[in-house]
Amino acid sequence: FSYNKFFLSYLRTFKRLELTAIPMAADTGPIGGNLSHEFIILADTGESKIFTDKRIFDLNSDGSKIEKKSLEELRKKYEKFYAVTDEKFNKNDFEKKVPEDYRLTTKGIEVGHIFYFGDKYSKPLKAGVDLPGGKKDFVKMGSYGVGVSRLVGAIIEAKYNEKDEVMKWPLSVAPYEIAIIPLINKNETSNLEKSKNIYNFLKNKNIDAILDDTDENFSSKIKKFNLIGVPYQILLGKKSYGDLIEFVETGKDSQSLSLEQIIKVLTEQKEKIWYLH
């Protein structure tokens, strides 16, 4: 049961990072046990060659209940589709189990690995619970690893637009949720005061904002935050929109919204991330 809970937790964690992870049946190796999965993120720079059924991408862990039967069914749903690294690849199996139109051969980065090895270690150590009648129930063990530094690389691989030189960190791990970027020069002084008011308003609404109050060139500021990867921006330039503010989701076109509408957008996005069911 615990193994399956971790299986679901890993899928949800990677989804919060806006990454599509493929769980693949893996060899337990010297660690032992009879159940193991590694989680692979597709990436051209990946070190692992993978062979999978494209239909696995249509699966969704949303709505999965934390119940023994439901979790086991979820895991088996994923295991139903062929997905292996080159260490376990068998050409005959691949061609037999996967229709030609659904075969995918590509590269990926391993970002997580989970093992269930039962009582392999607890039994020799006699680590368990004494039961009535002189019996003993040995502790069931597992190992659960996540490659944090690998995840950083995987996110950059997935979210950086090299052509436009724009990075957009997922909201769940972004250094800030929104950047306030005002045009400030000797001819434009009102923007600074306005940007400070917006900053304080957002902070009071528990929005993690950063204000660039330097006199750096306006377009350079925007380019800087595009590279840093803050997912949302408020731009205060020469144009006035009355009560509306120029709001940008990094890498997309801007739109004119009220401050209340911006709060709503950010709140809804955060709720999507943290309330996966």
Language model features by range: what are they?
Residues F1-H277:
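NTP/phosphate- and nucleic-acid-binding module
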